[in-house]
Regions:
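Gly/Gly-Pro-rich "capping" loops immediately C-terminal to redox-active cysteine motifs
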Residues: 63, 67, 80-111, 131
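Electrostatic cytochrome c docking/interface patches
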Residues: 26-71
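Juxtamembrane extracytosolic/periplasmic "stalk" immediately C-terminal to the first targeting helix
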Residues: 19-24
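C-terminal capping alpha-helices of c-type cytochrome domains
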Residues: 100-105, 128-152
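Bacterial signal peptide processing site
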Residues: 10-14
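Short, flexible, glycine-rich and Lys/Arg-enriched loop motifs at helix boundaries
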Residues: 111-131
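The canonical Cys-X-X-Cys-His
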Residues: 66, 72-81, 102, 143-147
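Sec-dependent bacterial lipoprotein signal peptides
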Residues: 1-8
Length: 152
């Protein structure tokens, strides 16, 4: 029996000395810096680049071009005036949202839903993500002209 105890004790071998290269100490939760929140204003996240619009055209030709964009991009499949379809009612859109916010939502809806609290609430209430339809910077003023012409 003593032989067994001797063999077991010797089999353990020497214990390594603790070194400073061992696992790093874990910081207490209070010492870990919090992730900063993104501050978003009424225009949406400013890291989404948009074309600055000095003026939204209101002439009939621009409004007509905007309707073509609205139809070609399939906007009417989800949006209407005076009623809610899949997406929000567009009546009075420019009185509820800023032009930069609308541009950002149309041109980068995924980022808006992730970073903008208003877009997140719209996503929650409508239960569907607005798809990115590829509206170009050149098409945007015409699309806004059409939307604004339909009702404020």
């Amino acid at each position: 029996m003593s032989l067994i105890l001797l063999l077991v004790a010797c089999a353990e071998g020497p214990k390594p000395a603790a070194t400073s290269a061992s696992a790093p100490a874990v910081k207490p939760a209070s010492a870990v810096a919090a992730v900063p929140t993104v501050e978003v204003g009424p225009d949406g996240p400013t890291e989404i680049a948009i074309v600055a619009l000095a003026d939204i055209p209101s002439d009939p030709a621009s409004v007509g071009e905007g309707q073509k964009v609205f139809d070609a991009k399939g906007c009417g499949g989800c949006h209407a005036w005076g009623s809610k379809l899949v997406g929000p009612d567009l009546t009075g859109l420019s009185t509820r949202r800023t032009i930069p916010w609308i541009q950002r939502m149309v041109q980068d809806p995924d980022t808006m839903t992730k970073k903008d609290p208003v877009a997140r609430e719209l996503f929650k209430s409508h239960m569907i993500q607005m798809p990115k339809q590829g509206v170009t910077d050149a098409e945007m003023p015409m699309l806004l002209a059409f939307v604004n012409s339909k009702g404020k």
